[in-house]
Amino acid sequence: MERNDIQKISSETANIPVYKQSAEYAIEHDELPAYRESFRVNMACRDALESAIHESYHDYCLDTGKAAAQVAAQFGMERVAYVLANTVRAFDHDGRISRDNKAWAQTVPVCTDADEWGHERSRYFLVSQVNPGLVNLLVSRVREELAREKDAPAKRSSVLEKIQKNKAAVQAKAAEKKLPGQER
């Protein structure tokens, strides 16, 4: 599959859940279509990450917020983290990736998925067409966003919102109960 074909993935297909098992497992459990779709979207996410880094890098500065938000909006933070963790694991030897990011990548479950020749299939969705130092900056930002999502309490409705919703419900019921000729 060509990179241009992968970029044509619709937003509907980009919402496919991350399949975290190997192809062998998928075959054994009749889940091969789910594996293939997830793999295809992982490659599209890789391309989107590389494009976002290229587009967000100006004057020796990477706008990590813009790049992360752009790709997360299209693929979801779980897939972005999965693809980036896979990339960092593959570049474990590279000094341009921080120790903290390397340690984080080890906490993200990525299965071993070797093909019949012993090559790791996850290598197909490595973010490798940009400088690893820029990938490191983006990984740090994604980790911050993940921590923010995790620490943010679920949005609770305010008392005013509850009163307004209740008032609207009461008014709707009252309007239904009014009989013709009883209008004031």
Model regions: which residues?
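Gram-negative host-targeted secretion-system effectors, predominantly Type III and Type IV
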Residues: 1-183
